[in-house]
Amino acid sequence: MSIIELSEKRFIRCILENGFLYDESHQGYTRVWETNTPDGKLQCLEVYKKDEDVWKQIMYGSDGGVFFTEDIDIDEHLP
């Protein structure tokens, strides 16, 4: 097993421990954030997924549109 594979396994374990679940429809690991507003609740979906050997963090708003995306270095996210 390569160092990259070990880092990915540790990263996935870390995000699972932080409330993410694998979501087939997004082909990545997701969790929902929710906040109260004067008009009700707003939700956003946070997704970590691997796309062509690059891990990405993607945030979707209540309307389903992407409002943030970033390529990430998984080693910076490991404890």
Language-model regions, residue ranges each:
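Short intrinsically disordered terminal tails
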Residues: 1-3, 76-79
